[in-house]
């Protein structure tokens, strides 16, 4: 249930009546890895992070995403707000919506007026999708009749330290390239994209060129999130990664992989962790790897299934002035 707590600075804070109960979490494998995330309004709300809800502008919202290879199993909204001292208790309320579904109501009590209040509202994880909006709606009253919605006495201030506590659990997804570049880059994930590049050993010039093409392509997708490409030599990564390998030069964990007869892009499980995926760029030699990298960057490969063969890459037309794709 939704509850309000007292703060040290404002010991007299009214009790908030219960909201809706949190629903049961989605059914997922209990042994899957999970992570706890705290998203504050300072991070995900429009600047400056705090909100002043008024009679004529009663709504405020925050937005957050969810990766396609994860599911939220628990969610809690932690609110810090101060209601106007002129409000009518109980008749004035703060309604909480997730994706336009009502999650609960926080009535304003007499003890809260003009004082900082802390409240918790459980969020039903079954309503959480790939893109989500939490909306706060202020229902304010300062007299029983003949109210002016533009009155300056109608306000409720929501602090920027308010936030969401989320528990994400990783799903064991199939090796399917039809959703590429997911899971190696997921546009729903607003964190910096860290994607290790794994080589059997120090790459030569042609392999450096191939890996640079792939890194540049992923970097263009990352955009404002930023990106990191740690380099590993003959090591297993601890997260989703890109692996470059040829028939003769490959990391030890791919030593039993069958030899290829053409450039191949394949999605496989991490040998020690099925929740981590590896994108293997395989070829007979470095020239094949360069061709596969160009195929990824130019986007003329039909990605589907666990692996695709890059038989040919059509050359790009010469660039014209002012035709940069990101302009």
Label every model-predicted segment.
Residues 1-327:
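Solvent-exposed alpha-helical segments and adjacent loops
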């Amino acid at each position: 249930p939704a509850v309000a707590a007292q703060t040290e600075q404002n010991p007299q804070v009214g009790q908030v009546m219960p909201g809706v109960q949190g629903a049961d979490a989605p059914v997922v494998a209990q042994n899957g890895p999970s992570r706890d995330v705290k998203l504050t309004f300072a991070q995900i709300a429009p600047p400056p992070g705090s909100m002043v809800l008024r009679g004529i502008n009663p709504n405020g919202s925050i937005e957050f995403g969810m990766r396609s290879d994860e599911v939220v199993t628990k969610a809690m909204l932690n609110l810090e707000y101060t209601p106007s001292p002129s409000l009518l208790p109980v008749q004035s309320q703060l309604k909480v919506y997730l994706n336009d579904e009502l999650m609960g109501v926080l009535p304003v009590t007499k003890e809260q007026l003009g004082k900082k209040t802390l409240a918790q509202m459980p969020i039903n994880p079954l309503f959480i999708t790939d893109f989500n909006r939490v909306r706060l709606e202020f229902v304010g009253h300062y007299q029983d009749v003949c109210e002016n919605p533009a009155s300056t006495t109608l306000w409720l201030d929501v602090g920027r330290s308010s936030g969401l506590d989320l528990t994400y659990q990783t799903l064991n997804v199939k090796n399917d390239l039809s959703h590429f570049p997911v899971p190696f880059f997921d546009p729903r994930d607003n964190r910096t994209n860290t994607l290790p590049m794994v080589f059997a050993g120090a790459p030569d010039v042609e392999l450096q060129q191939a890996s640079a093409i792939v890194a540049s392509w992923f970097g263009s997708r990352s955009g404002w999130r930023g990106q990191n490409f740690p380099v590993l030599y003959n090591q297993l990564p601890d997260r989703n990664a890109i692996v470059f390998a040829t028939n003769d030069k490959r990391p030890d964990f791919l030593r039993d992989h069958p030899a290829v007869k053409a450039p191949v892009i394949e999605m496989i499980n991490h040998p020690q962790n099925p929740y981590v995926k590896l994108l293997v760029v395989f070829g007979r030699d470095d020239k094949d790897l360069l061709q596969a990298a160009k195929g990824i960057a130019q986007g003329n490969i039909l990605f589907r299934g666990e692996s695709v063969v890059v038989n040919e890459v059509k050359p790009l037309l010469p660039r014209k002035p002012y035709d940069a794709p990101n302009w």
